[in-house]
Amino acid sequence: MKKILLCLIGIFIFTGAFSQDSLTSHYWTDGTAFNIPKHRWELGLFTASRYGIGKNLELSAHPLMFFLMPQVKIKVGWGEFSGFRLATEHGIFYPTQFMRLVATKGTGGLISPEFTIPQMFAISNRFLASYKPFKKAVLTAHAGITFAVKFGPLDKRTTIDLPVIYPRLAVFYNEPEFDAGVDFRGQFFPRFGWLFNVENFIICGTRNNYFLENKGVLAYTSKKETLRIEAGYKLCFGKYPAGPQWHLLPVIDLIFGIGR
């Protein structure tokens, strides 16, 4: 039971479901080239929490998992050009502590304890371009690259072959990883929003080199933009070591907004 719970928590944390309907105020804008307002907090239950450092600068991290599996990102807005909003996102991810925790026998074990997990981290860089095809909708395209730094060998038998988690850890076993995708979100009724996106991962140096994730979300936002409830699905396809697999996962989250 603990193993199943640990897997679900990990998948929810990696999944990150967002939607947006407050387009003019730039709330709930993770996954787009827009930054949240200065001094505003958005605290997610399963997703990364975000803070607006300045007009064109925001910081995101997972507070509940920070000491177990830290992942910190900074998004920099570069302004608007010919109707397109441009931004770059830069992050660092440290999975060593988490992988060592699950390297155990019995309940909660995802990796055999016979293997040594070295100190390692990954650095990611992503370019985002957003465009508003309609007044209450945003279309975003993004592309990025992630590469890993390891301070020792990592046995390929230590992979965690689970959807969402595997493609994000694959960079530690192979060459750099490229990602590209599109994100389409907006508002169809006051307080109700939607999101639909597709993300592709291409991993160099291995035959298990392609993963696809498609997410669809409906969301309700409170009148004062202090609470957002999201629910939907995530469809995953990947070329795992055991062969191609499909997975359909639920997506749920509560996000609390503080400040304007």
Predicted ranges, named:
Residues 20-21, 42-48, 185-188:
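Short hydrophobic/aromatic-rich motifs at helix boundaries and adjacent loops
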Residues 25, 115-260:
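Outer-membrane beta-barrel transmembrane domain signature
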Residues 63-151:
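Gram-negative (and chloroplast) outer-membrane scaffold detector with strong preference
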Residues 31, 35-67, 72-74, 78, ...:
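Transmembrane beta-strand segments that form the barrel wall of outer-membrane beta-barrel proteins
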Residues 4-15:
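Sec-dependent N-terminal signal peptides
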Residues 18-42, 247, 253-255, 259-260:
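Outer-membrane beta-barrel biogenesis signature
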